[in-house]
């Protein structure tokens, strides 16, 4: 039986889809059977980051409309045979997918994979509600910024209201030099504010951007890099391993940004 995990963020532009692609491939390299489901109807980008955009013939909407079999819409990654990609829709047509439909598709697939990772749309609208409907676990991706953390707080509330209580945190694009200068939230600050278990910390890096632009997620590179190692370690923690975190958070001080974000979160709308 699959572990069905939705990867979400609330705010767009935090690297959620990049995180999904790298964690998916990292899990596959760790001998797990992984399905990456792009649930961002109309604005899909996971295919580009995986370098699979030219191999898409059918998608989930085609399956639902009876135009193809489910197996025809699944794309096996030739670089990593344990990884399968499933686009829910095309960029050309933004048609609604219902909660019942995504649930039916996942039900047909869940016995064939160890992990199903669902790349959720940014925001908290209907697309988000559909993406989280079939999930049993959630990973919230944030950057150490005011807006990202405030939106993540809202998303966590929505997930809990849906009954998803197994929620983990990934802090992305951390810049240690800014943390030391007290111009960015530290790992400890973000953990304390959001109050959910930390499962990954990924530093900001041009290597991630370059790899994404090539359609080759960083974890595919045989050369060891700090962000690549961070993604792999995150995948290992998802599998239940006790993996020590890279120490990015060596500065302890009273950061004024921490107080600011705490106040913002307290003022945010809690009526989910």
Curated annotation (Swiss-Prot):
Species whose genome carries this gene: Emiliania huxleyi (Coccolithophore)
Keyword GTP-binding applies: no
InterPro entries assigned to the protein according to its UniProt record, in alphabetical order: CobQ/CobB/MinD/ParA_Nub-bd_dom, MinD, MinD_FleN, P-loop_NTPase, ParA/MinD_ATPase
Function according to Swiss-Prot or TrEMBL: ATPase required for the correct placement of the division site.
Gene3D superfamilies reported in the protein's UniProt record: P-loop containing nucleotide triphosphate hydrolases
GO terms for biological process, alphabetical: cell division; negative regulation of cell division
Family: Belongs to the ParA family. MinD subfamily.
Protein name: Putative septum site-determining protein MinD
Subcellular localization: Plastid, Chloroplast
Keywords from the named record: ATP-binding, Cell cycle, Cell division, Chloroplast, Nucleotide-binding, Plastid, Septation
Record GO terms (molecular function): ATP binding; ATP hydrolysis activity
Transmembrane segments: none
Signal peptide: none
């Amino acid at each position: 039986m699959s572990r069905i995990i939705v990867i979400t963020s609330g705010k767009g532009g935090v690297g959620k889809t990049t995180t999904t692609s790298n964690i998916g491939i990292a899990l596959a390299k760790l001998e797990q059977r992984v399905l990456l489901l792009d649930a961002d109807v109309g604005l899909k980008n996971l295919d580009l980051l995986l370098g699979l955009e030219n191999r898409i013939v059918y998608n989930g909407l085609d399956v639902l409309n009876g135009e193809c079999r489910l197996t025809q819409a699944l794309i096996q990654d030739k670089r990593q045979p344990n990884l399968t990609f499933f686009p829910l829709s095309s960029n050309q047509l933004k048609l609604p997918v219902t909660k019942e439909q995504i649930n039916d598709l996942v039900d047909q697939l869940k016995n064939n994979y160890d992990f199903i990772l669902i790349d959720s749309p940014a925001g908290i609208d209907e697309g988000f509600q559909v993406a989280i409907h079939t999930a049993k676990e959630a990973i919230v991706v944030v950057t150490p910024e005011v807006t990202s953390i405030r939106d993540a707080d809202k998303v966590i509330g929505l997930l809990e209201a849906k009954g998803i209580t197994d929620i983990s945190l990934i802090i992305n694009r951390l810049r240690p030099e800014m943390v030391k200068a007290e111009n960015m939230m530290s790992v400890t600050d973000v953990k304390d504010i959001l109050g959910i278990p930390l499962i990954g910390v990924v530093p900001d890096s041009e290597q991630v951007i370059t790899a994404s632009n090539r359609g080759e997620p960083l974890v595919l590179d045989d050369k060891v890099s700090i962000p690549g190692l961070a993604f792999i370690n995150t995948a290992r923690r998802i599998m239940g391993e006790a993996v020590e975190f890279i120490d990015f958070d060596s500065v302890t001080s009273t950061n004024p940004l921490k107080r600011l974000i705490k106040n913002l979160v307290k003022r945010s709308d809690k009526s989910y």
